Design a protein with these regions (language model features):
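Structural and coupling elements of P-loop NTPases
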Residues: 1-412
């Protein structure tokens, strides 16, 4: 409850880094009031108390933030001057400090590798390209993104970044992309723990709403991914349609790649939501996830309508004509579960019967729209997502097809 006539209490629920004011804690004042230059007590973990002074104060009104001299209970404010502030801390009255119930932050469940972009198109669009730029940006993010973890690897241009899910990490990637960074990211992997000699993996509670027509398709796919159905009920709408509401307990790795797959199989009618539940013992049997094969560009150049037309019967295309490609770039999904090197830069040459430009009109299937969410769900262990300010590209880790064949034979 909001109490005006009481000592100051404010629970910090978010952090923001201001270039001029430093780190600012954001939260709603539960009781009392706060003013600029006021001395307060910061109540942290395990009863820690640190005195501090409010150097700057801003009040939120909708999406706008305005500097103020003071704020009262019920207002959402941003407080500067407390360098040690963290999510879950209480900003309290200096003379009568009483902590509010602390919020807990979920541990990371998914990790992926962020590395310097080393593709043939590297450096064309971005402003920040080097490992130093990447390292500074990732470690700066730790100041406000408290559930993120960044670890250095044995390679100076590669970092292991862990977060609370694919969405958490994709938001960071999109922010960096808009800021002008170029980077490459790997396939997301779940983080497993070992407790008492047992391997523990993260599980989530998954809620799905889907038209009754597609319930069999959804249930079959979730069964392959070790989903355990907890609840199912039929929902009748006012317009005469029926939908199934399904609740599942499922491993986090069973959710990876699930959204786009179900959207395709249900013609875009499925709605799903998932939240972290707990770490539980990992089952020995593996997920029955169907592997995918990719169409991989065989040479550098610009794609042509003729080559796309001849290739599209092999599977779903990710690019259209007139797109620059490089050898080893993934340009589509093969209809078979194996990679296929294709030449999408091939020109139609003239013959002694007709000129190269005179032929029937080519009907090209529109390419699949490339989004960051789709890219992260699609890529396999031997593929990367190339992220630049203007483009998202999929590529093989090893661009040379001979190197890929050698690696496959050696089992790497």
């Amino acid at each position: 409850a909001i109490t005006v006539d009481a000592p100051l209490q404010m629970l910090v629920l978010a952090l923001v880094q201001d270039p001029y004011k430093g780190k600012m804690g954001i939260g709603k004042i539960q009781s009392g009031s706060i003013a600029r230059r006021q001395t307060v007590m910061l109540l942290g973990k395990d009863g820690a108390q640190v005195a501090g002074k409010v150097s700057d104060l801003a009040v939120y009104s909708g999406l706008d933030r305005a500097d103020m001299e003071q704020a009262a209970a019920g207002e959402i404010v941003a407080v500067a001057g407390l360098d040690d502030v963290s999510i879950g801390d209480t900003i309290a009255d200096a003379d009568r400090p009483v902590a509010l119930p602390r919020v807990t932050i979920d541990e990371p469940t998914v990790q992926m590798t962020f590395s310097v972009n080393n593709s043939p198109f590297a450096g064309r669009e971005g402003k920040f390209l080097t490992s130093r730029h990447l390292r500074e940006r990732l470690f700066k993010e730790l100041e406000t993104n408290v559930s993120l973890r960044v670890n250095e690897t044995d390679s100076a241009d590669r970092f292991l970044v862990a977060g609370r899910g694919e969405l958490h990490l994709s938001v960071l990637i999109e922010q960096m992309r808009r800021e002008g960074y170029e980077l490459q990211v790997s396939q997301p992997e779940v983080i497993v723990h070992r407790e008492g000699g047992k391997v523990m993996e993260p599980y989530e509670e998954l809620t799905i709403q889907v038209p009754e027509t597609y319930q069999g398709t959804v249930i079959e796919e979730l069964g392959k991914r070790r989903g355990e159905m907890r609840h199912m009920r039929l929902i009748h709408s006012d317009v005469g349609t029926s939908e199934m509401h399904l609740e599942y307990h499922i491993p986090t790795r069973g959710i990876m790649g699930l959204k786009n797959l179900l959207l395709a199989k249900t013609r875009g009618t499925v709605i799903l939501h998932h939240v972290f539940a707990a770490y539980e013992p990992a089952e020995e049997r593996d997920l029955l996830v169907t592997p995918h094969g990719s169409l991989v560009a065989y040479e550098d150049g610009a794609s042509t309508g003729y080559a796309i037309f001849m290739t599209q019967e092999r599977g779903a295309m990710f690019i259209g004509p007139g797109v620059e490609v490089y050898r080893g770039m993934v340009i589509g999904q093969n209809s078979r579960d194996e990679d296929l090197d294709v030449n999408v830069c091939k020109e139609k040459h003239l013959s002694n019967m007709r000129a190269s430009g005179t032929d029937e009109a080519l009907v090209l299937t529109p390419p699949r729209e490339m989004t960051l969410e789709f890219a992260l769900e699609y890529i396999g262990g031997d593929e990367l997502v190339e992220v630049t300010p203007q483009h998202l590209r999929l590529r093989k880790r090893l661009l040379n097809p001979d190197d890929r064949r050698k690696a496959k034979k050696s089992g790497k």
